[in-house]
Amino acid sequence: MRVLHVCSELYPILKTGGLADVTAALPPALAGFGVDSRVLVPGFPAFINAIKDKQLLINIPSRFGAEEINIFLAKISNTKIDIYVIDAPSLFARPGNPYADSSNQAYADNYLRFALLGWVAARISEGLDAKWKPEIVHSHDWHAGLVPAYIKASELASGKKAVKTVFTVHNLAYQGLFPMSVFAELDLPGIFLSMNGLEFYGQVSFMKAGLYFADKITTVSPTYAKEIQIYEQGCGLEGLLADRHNDLYGVLNGVDPQIWNPKKDSLIATNYSSTTVATGKAKCKLALQQMMGLAEKEDALLFGIVTRLTEQKGLNLLIEAIGEITSRGGQIVLLGSGDKALEEVFLAAAKKYSKSIAVQIGYDEEQAHRIIAGSDVIMVPSRFEPCGLTQLYGLTYGTLPLVHKVGGLADTVIDSSLENLADGTATGFVFDEFSVESLTLAIRRAFALYNRKTDWKKVRKTAMQQQVTWDSSAEKIYQIYKNLVRENN
């Protein structure tokens, strides 16, 4: 079975969030089920500089504002992934963030940049590469939302049955919204600009295009699949998603054990397994405390936070709960960037409690590994969280997740309640209500369990035994593909 994945990010070449981890890990996981995957990406500088053995497939005349477009088939160093790259310098050859300028303002022509991505995907689905034609095209998030629309448009124009499409929502809150006036530049049928198409409250929505035109929709956890069908989490698309509930699947993301594995992680102070976790984590913790300038206290409960600094991630709650941690002798290490006001608040807290709180603004993949290995608790207090990967990394490294009961966090972390402790299923700490009071109670329960060393070790061992790799999730995705291919035959 041949599957084309269409996305804007791919780890380790280009990553701004968890999307990149998923698009890198899913194709190799699907290979175990006989799926021949290729990936299509925009020609951002990171991709152009990373590819090797490139072959020019076709040169396309000016389109979507791009003066010159070359489509290459290439390899990525140290992987087996075949990748198609759209080299259109006038659209993609820009430094830094792939979506926004140096002032963090979204590029005004993003609609053209990602329309080209969708249009090329449709051409590949029709046989642009004479040697490889996909049976399924699987697009990811709003950047690739127009992929199913262009494929459907081709089907309507030709009268021929098109390949089947799958669209994955990684985060419904980012929708790719543009003024209605841009529709004329997208080269799509006029009938697509309607409520039954791209129109969304007087705007054009790339996300809605994917949700409406794809044959099947997946999102990244069972709970999130339910949440986005109701008003509170539906971002205005809950009606469409509820209408399509029979085509909507919640499939958890997984952890790539080649990258996230304490037994062989070369980025952490020492390797460890579930049998050597006590001594291993103690060494990683000391190394982290030394690196970040914290007091070197083995018995201090260390809370790690690796996140984008946004209101969605629950950082406003955490600010209010800092005193609860420091007053009990706990420590905090935070890695992240985002909202400037939040950055300033956390930097001020680190200055005030320099031996208890350390903050590193920015994103550093290596430091993320060190924080997750060296912390006792990994905090993910998000207001909403489609899946979340950080808590899965925490489970893998024996770093107990403290999470809000929402989305994928609710699906993957089992609270250390008395009942769950008694039956040996507890893996972390879960708070139900998105409030400072509820978060504070969870923090107190973490301290209480930490003081009961035997119970803490049991929960940590259970956490590390959780099956959070891609194996079972890839099988579920494969079954969706298989059913679609059967429908098309």
From Swiss-Prot:
Q: Which SUPFAM superfamilies match?
A: UDP-Glycosyltransferase/glycogen phosphorylase
State the EC number(s): 2.4.1.21
Q: Does the keyword Glycosyltransferase apply?
A: yes
Q: Which domain of life is it from?
A: Bacteria
- Matching Pfam families: Glyco_transf_5, Glycos_transf_1
Catalysed reactions, semicolon-separated: [(1->4)-alpha-D-glucosyl](n) + ADP-alpha-D-glucose = [(1->4)-alpha-D-glucosyl](n+1) + ADP + H(+)
Which residues does the annotation say bind ADP-alpha-D-glucose?
Answer: K15
Identify the CDD domains for this entry.
GT5_Glycogen_synthase_DULL1-like
A cellular-component GO term for this protein? cytosol
Pathway membership: Glycan biosynthesis; glycogen biosynthesis
Q: Which GO terms describe its biological process?
A: glycogen biosynthetic process
Q: Name one GO molecular function term.
A: alpha-1,4-glucan glucosyltransferase (UDP-glucose donor) activity
Which keywords does the record carry?
Answer: Glycogen biosynthesis, Glycosyltransferase, Transferase
Query: Which positions are tagged coiled coil?
Result: none
Free-text function comment from the UniProt entry: Synthesizes alpha-1,4-glucan chains using ADP-glucose.
Protein family membership:
Belongs to the glycosyltransferase 1 family. Bacterial/plant glycogen synthase subfamily.
Q: Which PANTHER family does the annotation name?
A: ALPHA AMYLASE DOMAIN-CONTAINING PROTEIN, GRANULE-BOUND STARCH SYNTHASE 1, CHLOROPLASTIC/AMYLOPLASTIC
- Name this protein carries in UniProt: Glycogen synthase
Q: Which organism is it from?
A: Francisella tularensis subsp. tularensis (strain SCHU S4 / Schu 4)
